[in-house]
UniProtKB/Swiss-Prot annotation:
Transmembrane segments: none annotated. Residues 508-550, 754-767 have a biased composition (Low complexity). PANTHER family: ARGININE/SERINE-RICH PROTEIN PNISR (PTHR31518). It comes from the Eukaryota. It comes from Homo sapiens (Human). This is Arginine/serine-rich protein PNISR. The keyword Nucleus applies. Interacts with PNN. It is found in: Nucleus speckle. Residues 237-276, 429-461, 673-703 form a coiled coil. Belongs to the splicing factor SR family. Residues 551-579, 587-598, 607-639, 771-781, 789-805 have a biased composition (Basic residues). The modification Phosphoserine is found at residues 204, 211, 290, 304, 313, 321, 465, 467, 726. The modification Phosphothreonine is found at residue 485. The lineage of its organism: Eukaryota, Metazoa, Chordata, Craniata, Vertebrata.
Amino acid sequence: MWDQGGQPWQQWPLNQQQWMQSFQHQQDPSQIDWAALAQAWIAQREASGQQSMVEQPPGMMPNGQDMSTMESGPNNHGNFQGDSNFNRMWQPEWGMHQQPPHPPPDQPWMPPTPGPMDIVPPSEDSNSQDSGEFAPDNRHIFNQNNHNFGGPPDNFAVGPVNQFDYQHGAAFGPPQGGFHPPYWQPGPPGPPAPPQNRRERPSSFRDRQRSPIALPVKQEPPQIDAVKRRTLPAWIREGLEKMEREKQKKLEKERMEQQRSQLSKKEKKATEDAEGGDGPRLPQRSKFDSDEEEEDTENVEAASSGKVTRSPSPVPQEEHSDPEMTEEEKEYQMMLLTKMLLTEILLDVTDEEIYYVAKDAHRKATKAPAKQLAQSSALASLTGLGGLGGYGSGDSEDERSDRGSESSDTDDEELRHRIRQKQEAFWRKEKEQQLLHDKQMEEEKQQTERVTKEMNEFIHKEQNSLSLLEAREADGDVVNEKKRTPNETTSVLEPKKEHKEKEKQGRSRSGSSSSGSSSSNSRTSSTSSTVSSSSYSSSSGSSRTSSRSSSPKRKKRHSRSRSPTIKARRSRSRSYSRRIKIESNRARVKIRDRRRSNRNSIERERRRNRSPSRERRRSRSRSRDRRTNRASRSRSRDRRKIDDQRGNLSGNSHKHKGEAKEQERKKERSRSIDKDRKKKDKEREREQDKRKEKQKREEKDFKFSSQDDRLKRKRESERTFSRSGSISVKIIRHDSRQDSKKSTTKDSKKHSGSDSSGRSSSESPGSSKEKKAKKPKHSRSRSVEKSQRSGKKASRKHKSKSRSR
């Protein structure tokens, strides 16, 4: 083909140059009808094949290649390397374009038809384009089916040209073929003549010749058979393959649209069924997803195989494939990508979570056994043996140390967490206790304030009532004293003065005692003392006025006593005054009792508040004493045991006797010590009992004192009433006796009456004072009897004096 029996072939380059110049001005090669072009090329080839067969020498093959030249290898390129036109034609023009140099359709000469070849019928692999094989005898003949048809042979050497590997993106040196990579197979420089038999070909060559999508496609031009197709040049075959691929894409799009329409119908039906049914139902799964996944994998494989195969224009294919995608397809691909990404993310996250959970569970499970192994003596004994130490590895020890450190860290964290929880609980309890204590203190303060307010109000009310009663008594006394005789007034006023003086003394004592107890009580006592002093001053003033008024009326006494009407008036006024006095005394006694009861209640509360603190102190002191006693007893016992042991160690009989004596002495000492201890304990118990008895006595004395005060007041009131009654009886008897002795002269009667009245008035207060000093204060009956005896004695003395005169 190339040398034509040693002569260079000059028509092909010239025609090729003309065709290249014309092809540059043509339209896009994708718009060419490759089927018609292939048929025209086959027709021209058949027409020109007959002439070439006639002109061809016998020793040459139809392609113009000699057997010797094919076998010689690299030595058959001398003419081509020396020709300058050849290098000028191949290097600049073929390197400029990515499209192969297609021969012009109106070319006058075409390569001759091949010679006799043994063509094997197509095998089962119907899609492969290399199913035909040469005979073993013609193995070294140039193969028309490979991609080097229409170009220089593989062993032709050309100057170095930069190449680019589309698979890896790295520049490397030219192969031995020396031609541009888009038109020759990329790959490392191999042997000069690769094996052309199918069995000896590499697997990449077989994969390269197959179509990327193995789908049954209908071939429109039925005139072109598989055998004729193999005879076509590579650039025509590539054009045909492009056409077939476009047709396949169209068919796939139609099929996808049909499937989508079917899916939409099925989904509508499923939604209608779900709405009509009771519960929600899952959509029926179609085969569309799986088919799409398979198609994606096939497209990926096709893309990978397309990189290996020789493609004249890979960039325009991608550019043309992008606009061919519809919006629905793009959306569907985006959905698939999002599904893939979401599933991958979900799987990654779940894997991480499962790993961490399993790690935590494993760590918790291995905590306790790891500690037990570390602390066990059996493991230490095993590790101490020399033979067993070599079985362990460094990795296992590191892992154990890591586990131990992790377990220790977790233990520390747990302990800290527990400590924090306990501290928080303790702080909460303290706060609650403080709040409760504050509330109790506030309540106590409020109670004390209420009690003080009530006491003050009660005291004010009592003072007002006392002032009213005293005013009434003063008015009644003034009225009664005006009506009484001077003897009666003097006799009645003296016991009143004495009674008031005693009450003053008792009040002063009670005021002094209460002032020492509390400030509030001192205030109440001071107010009561001031009120009593004011009442006493008013009563004393009234008595003075009554005494002054009664002194000039002594002369008229005899005349008044004689009339019976005057006696009746006196008895009425006395009874009325007695009633008023009794009521006033009762009111005063009640008021005093109330005051004392309030004071006693306050003092009892204070003692109760103090008593638990005292009991606590006593219990603490008792516990300390008991501890000291126990410690001393334990020491004495230890000493005895030590002495006994020492005595047992000595083996001599003399020593035994001495030890027995010493033991007896020690026993006596211990007995004496025990006796002393018992005595001390008894004394302490007695002291405690005495203290308790003292407390009880104090309480009883306090109760008795309160009762005695009440009894004293009652007795004093009764004494006053008895004295007033006895004086009135004496006066009545004296008047009756004077009336019976009227037989004597008037002068003597007047003198005797005046003297006796003066003496009786003067003697009666003195005798009453002496008798008061002699009277006991405890029994009520004694006071009544003494008052009666004193009245009898006074009457007897008065009788004796009157008789003597």
